[in-house]
């Protein structure tokens, strides 16, 4: 099947979906209606571009016809030739765009994520920068219309985060944040630095897919669940009833502690959500390493300790080392305006995959 047959098949299916979504039987079946709506939405951009492309092809035919029928009218012929030139350039642009739109979609792109940020090398300054990254992602999520919920947080004495875990849910969350895993380096003068020297610190980000219980089932025998009293500042117990939960996955020794909520049940539910994501992610990594068919995507090495980005405060500069992108917009980016970075990463990934297909 060539690209034109593929595009026509997508358009035919899109029109069929439009009819199905108007069918009362489908409308009354919520699950099927949602599935078909999602499929229609995923094809919409491709169909719109294909229809515009067909119009460009018609414009080429019309311009060629106009040249033939210009009847010696130099001005009309010149205008038609310019229209033909413009239409042919548009045709090439649309063909590249449509090839990218037809690339196999990551089946996980519409999924929610669990985001982990940790202060790494650099002590208090690294923990403070972890907080800056948390704020950046929170504001980006807000701008996207996503829900951002901090599920677990371990703070240090200066207001930074040793570790913070958040659930990000909404449309196309994973598709836009999947490239954020790795080491984020910051270069700036710490608040505590009296000599004005620039220090380098690092925070790590890990993006994991939210995993539903029906998608990944953990054997209860593999879990140890401890219930204890939640503690507040200074270590004092703040609840008379034991509400804090610690869950350990015994085969991997992956551990989650949760005391953010007021009830044991809610803490347990949140802890299970995190541990399910971590365990699934752990085994997915092993499987991919064994197959050497990297889950890593084509961007970077996929190593979670790989330095992916540097934030240089003195020069107001952000550099993404994987794609050689440098922007003198650090303040803008840290305020949550990540679109320029995300779009560049998505485009680079698509271009690399297109090159692989063309080999």
Swiss-Prot record:
Pfam families: PCRF, RF-1
Keywords in alphabetical order: Cytoplasm, Methylation, Protein biosynthesis
GO molecular function per UniProt: translation release factor activity, codon specific
Record-level GO cellular component terms: cytoplasm
Top-rank lineage group of the source organism: Bacteria
Keyword Protein biosynthesis applies: yes
Major subcellular site: cytoplasm
Post-translational modification: Methylated by PrmC. Methylation increases the termination efficiency of RF1.
PROSITE patterns in UniProt: RF_PROK_I
InterPro entries: PCRF (IPR005139), Pep_chain_release_fac_I (IPR000352), Pep_chain_release_fac_I_sf (IPR045853), Prokaryotic/Mito_RF (IPR050057), RF-1 (IPR004373)
PANTHER family in the cross-refs: LD18447P
Family: Belongs to the prokaryotic/mitochondrial release factor family.
Name of the protein described by the UniProt record: Peptide chain release factor 1
Species classification: Bacteria, Bacillati, Bacillota, Bacilli, Lactobacillales
């Amino acid at each position: 099947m060539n690209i034109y047959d593929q595009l026509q098949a997508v358009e035919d299916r899109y029109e069929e979906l439009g009819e199905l979504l108007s069918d009362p039987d489908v409308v009354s079946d919520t699950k099927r209606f949602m599935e078909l709506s999602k499929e229609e939405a995923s094809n919409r951009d491709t169909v719109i571009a294909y229809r515009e492309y067909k119009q460009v092809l018609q414009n080429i035919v019309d311009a060629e016809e106009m040249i033939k029928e210009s009847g010696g009218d130099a001005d009309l012929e010149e205008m038609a030739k310019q229209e033909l030139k413009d239409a042919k350039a548009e045709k090439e642009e649309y063909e590249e765009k449509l090839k990218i739109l037809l690339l196999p979609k990551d089946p996980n792109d519409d999924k929610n994520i669990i985001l982990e940020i940790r202060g790494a090398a650099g002590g208090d300054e690294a923990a403070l920068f972890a907080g800056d990254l948390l704020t950046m992602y929170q504001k980006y999520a807000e701008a996207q219309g996503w829900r951002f919920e901090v599920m677990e947080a371990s703070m240090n004495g200066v207001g930074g985060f040793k570790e913070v875990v958040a659930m990000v849910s909404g449309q196309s969350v994973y598709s836009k944040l999947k490239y954020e895993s790795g080491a984020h380096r910051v270069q700036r003068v710490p608040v505590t630095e009296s000599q004005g020297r620039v220090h380098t610190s690092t925070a790590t980000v890990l993006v994991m897919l939210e995993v539903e219980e029906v998608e990944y089932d953990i054997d209860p025998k593999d879990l140890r669940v401890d219930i204890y009293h939640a503690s507040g500042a200074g270590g004092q117990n703040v609840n008379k009833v034991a509400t804090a939960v610690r869950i350990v996955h015994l085969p991997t020794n992956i551990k989650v502690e949760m005391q953010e909520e007021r009830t044991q049940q809610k803490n347990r539910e949140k802890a299970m959500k995190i541990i399910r994501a971590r365990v699934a992610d752990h085994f997915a990594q092993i499987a991919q390493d064994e197959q050497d068919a990297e889950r890593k995507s084509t961007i970077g090495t996929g190593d979670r300790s790989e330095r992916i980005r540097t934030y240089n405060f003195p020069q107001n500069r952000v550099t993404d080392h994987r794609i050689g992108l440098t922007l003198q917009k650090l303040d803008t980016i840290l305020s949550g305006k990540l679109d320029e970075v995300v779009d560049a990463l998505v485009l680079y990934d698509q271009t690399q995959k297109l090159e692989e297909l063309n080999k």
